[in-house]
Amino acid sequence: MNTRTVGWFEITATDPDRCRKFYDGLFGWEFTEAEAGYWTVAGPGSSSMGALRSGDRDELTIFVVCEVAGTLSHLESLGARVIASPSRTPAGDLQAVVEDVRSNRLGLSSSGTPVAWFEIGTDDPGATRKFYENAFGWTSERDEAAEGVEYYSFLAPGAEQPIGGIFAGAGDYAIPGLLVSDVEDVLDRCERSGGSRVMGPVSDGNGLTIGQFTDPSGNRWSSFAVPSGG
């Protein structure tokens, strides 16, 4: 389906001013209002990578595809359910929303800038792996370095490095991931700024450290740090 990777995210907040202050303090993110109640999000000195929407809709991890309508039909044939048909966002991108076979909400977009990682939590890893492999032509491999947990990495066709992963037995969710220099520092500052620590930090056998947090509005993230020289 010519899917590249996760290329956008969308978070929501009933108190967007508080949300913007949280991310500005945590990561220095910049918010540009595209229309009332909708802001694009960019890291310091970088292009837009996501959006903040006023409201209480579920956050979205958004996959960049070459053809939104065609991908939507393909996912429906695999058991996905359409939540929102293709329409233009205030940022101008064509976007649709589906639920995967575990009822995780995903976005499909016509454009975007790849984010560092994404993670799919599932209590049925077999069905989840099959869905995403058939949906986007990815392969999944067991991460043997992830000691004590069942974790799989996704690879896109022709890719040398994984683009995301499946965490088995961790409940059902679909969240974007952020590359950070110090996971414990991010989790600590998140808590002091009104967010919550969901898990971690934990490290695998290769020295990769991960953690999860939610912002004050409940938007959930994975964060990870690679070992020095990694």
Regions found by a protein language model. Give the residues of each.
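N-terminal beta-strand motif that seeds the catalytic metal site of vicinal oxygen chelate
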Residues: 1-20, 47, 59-61, 107-130, ...
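Vicinal oxygen chelate
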Residues: 2, 5-14, 53-123, 141-145, 187-230, ...
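Fold-core signature of tandem repeat domains
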Residues: 9-11, 22, 27-29, 41, ...
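Conserved active-site tyrosine of GNAT-family acetyltransferases
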Residues: 19, 23, 75, 103, ...
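Residues at alpha-helix termini
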Residues: 27, 78, 134-136, 193
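Conserved short beta-strand elements that form part of the metal-binding/catalytic scaffold
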Residues: 27-59, 105-110, 139-173, 220-226
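Structured core of small recognition/catalytic domains
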Residues: 126, 132, 139-209, 215-220
